[in-house]
């Protein structure tokens, strides 16, 4: 009898070839790091292969942070970029000493600072800036326009950077941008 369960076949040879191509492309740039978006597919076997190829993990939930750790990603190659982070998710990431939180707002920055202080930690953060740049992709997955709800408005950036630099349990590392998905025209990024 055939089991009544889904079956997924992954071409791991193709995955490895793709990862090798990525490694070759970034080899001339030692300070350039590629992170795999865990939300694309969090199959543990695939994550192990991706981790073994040296990529980092881009996570959007505490569960994904934990899956990345479980798959062997070094904590210093994990970035947590999700919106609406709960206290337990922030604490999970702090406990593992991940590389960086991408922060969406002043209240989120203040919560991370407070939880880091409580845990005796310094949280590394980048600020997600909404640059008001149009990405030429499907309208439902554009995230970098002023009318989108994601990130810190460009006009507020300086104020939030100054706050991040003043908070005692925050280490301000830089800026983060995400203007949309499935972008095929690289000119969209030139506007950044």
Q: Which role does the model predict for each range below?
A:
Residues 1-123, 162, 166-172, 187, ...:
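A charged N-terminal "starter" segment
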Residues 37, 124-130, 176-178:
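Short beta-strand segments
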Residues 68-73, 130-131, 138:
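Nucleic-acid-contacting surfaces of polymerase cores and analogous helical-repeat interfaces
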Residues 131-192:
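Active-site loop/helix belt of alpha/beta enzymes
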């Amino acid at each position: 009898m055939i089991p009544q369960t889904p079956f997924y076949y992954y071409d791991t040879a193709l995955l490895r070839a793709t990862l090798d191509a990525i490694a070759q492309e970034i080899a001339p740039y030692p300070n350039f790091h590629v992170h795999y978006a865990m939300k694309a597919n969090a199959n543990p076997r695939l994550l192990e292969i991706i981790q073994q190829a040296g990529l980092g993990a881009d996570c959007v939930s505490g569960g994904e942070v934990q899956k990345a750790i479980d798959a062997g990603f070094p904590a210093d190659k994990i970035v947590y970029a999700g919106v609406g982070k709960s206290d337990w998710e922030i604490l999970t990431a702090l406990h593992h000493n991940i590389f960086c939180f991408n922060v969406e707002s002043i209240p989120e920055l203040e919560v991370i600072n407070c939880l880091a202080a409580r845990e005796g930690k310094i949280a590394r953060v980048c600020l997600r800036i909404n640059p008001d740049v149009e990405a030429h992709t499907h309208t439902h997955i554009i995230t970098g326009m002023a009318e989108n709800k994601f990130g810190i408005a460009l006009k507020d950036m300086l104020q939030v950077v100054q706050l991040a630099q003043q908070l005692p349990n925050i280490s301000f590392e830089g800026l983060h941008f995400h203007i949309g998905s499935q972008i095929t025209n690289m000119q969209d990024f030139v506007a950044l």
